[in-house]
A protein has these predicted regions:
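Transmembrane alpha-helical segments and their short flanking loops
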Residues: 124-225
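Membrane-water interface of transmembrane alpha-helices in multipass transporters/channels
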Residues: 28-34, 59-71, 136-145, 178-185
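Helix-loop-helix junctions within the multi-pass membrane cores of secondary transporters/permeases
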Residues: 72-154, 209, 222-223
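Membrane-water interface at transmembrane helix exits
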Residues: 2-6, 51, 55-59, 95, ...
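Alpha-helical transmembrane segments of multipass membrane proteins
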Residues: 43-47, 51, 115, 122, ...
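Juxtamembrane loop-helix boundary motifs flanking transmembrane segments in multi-pass membrane proteins
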Residues: 10-29, 59-62, 66, 82, ...
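Membrane-spanning helices that line or support transport/gating and their immediate boundary helices
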Residues: 29, 49-57, 65-66, 70, ...
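Signature of multi-pass transmembrane helix bundles
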Residues: 1-65, 225
Length: 225
């Protein structure tokens, strides 16, 4: 079989040369994808630091200590890839951050469904990178409208592995002009780093709970663990 492959293709060119060419293209694409994943991971870190910095301004506490207490939820989400499955851990760590149980019990399950900031960031970044790679035209108004509609769509996206990208396929096609091949690449890119997006989502839920608790929580005298 190997000999027949190496003897040549339909046009007489050595098949081994074709295989090398395809392998080189795949390698280049994979390198680009790895760079995209790295950039998005850094953006997720920046987003979490930003969210907890804002929350810290309301509660007057160290944002990095607040973020550090949410790390069990972050690492649990890396494994489950599901916001819904991580709710018990997220809820426990949010209470440890000083949020009252009533507020945490309301905000965390709700945000597991409607707060998908990490997934939204990831979809926008992947879509932009793919359009640049494919030479597709784009401009700021197009992406502004896409981000607005994506934010609404993410409210309806299920908190399960791959739920966000599947919910976003419609607007990727209608607003950005993605065909079947582009949508397939988006799904592949998204699934490859789904765990990081989910971890960003659930960890950010704790920051929202802190802000809501500041305004509506009934504080008790229990020490913060």
């Amino acid at each position: 079989i190997v000999q027949s492959i190496c003897e040549g293709g339909d046009d007489g060119a050595p098949a081994a040369t074709k295989v090398d060419s395809i392998t080189g293209q795949v390698y280049n694409i994979l390198m680009v994808f790895i760079k995209i994943i790295g950039v998005i991971f850094l953006l997720h870190i920046f987003l979490l630091v930003f969210q907890y910095t804002i929350a810290a301004l309301f509660v007057h506490r160290n944002p990095f200590k607040l973020l550090g207490k949410m790390m069990p939820a972050y690492f649990t989400a890396l494994g489950t890839q599901s916001s819904a499955a991580t709710i018990p851990v997220t809820l426990r760590q949010t209470v440890k951050n000083g949020v009252t149980e009533d507020i945490a019990g309301f905000v965390i399950p709700l945000c597991a469904t409607i707060h998908l900031s990490g997934s939204t960031l990831k979809i926008v970044a992947c879509a932009l990178a793919l359009m640049i790679m494919q030479g597709m035209p784009f401009d700021f108004p197009m992406f502004a409208g896409f981000i607005f509609m994506l934010g609404i769509t993410m409210v309806a996206a299920p908190g399960v592995p791959g739920g966000a990208i599947m919910a976003a396929l419609g607007i990727l096609a209608s607003m950005l002009g993605f065909g079947e091949s582009e949508q397939a690449l988006m799904i592949a890119l998204y699934i490859a780093m789904d765990s990081f997006g989910t971890a960003c989502n659930v960890t950010g839920d704790g920051a929202i709970a802190l802000i809501i608790d500041k305004f509506f929580g009934k504080k008790d005298l229990r020490p913060i663990q």
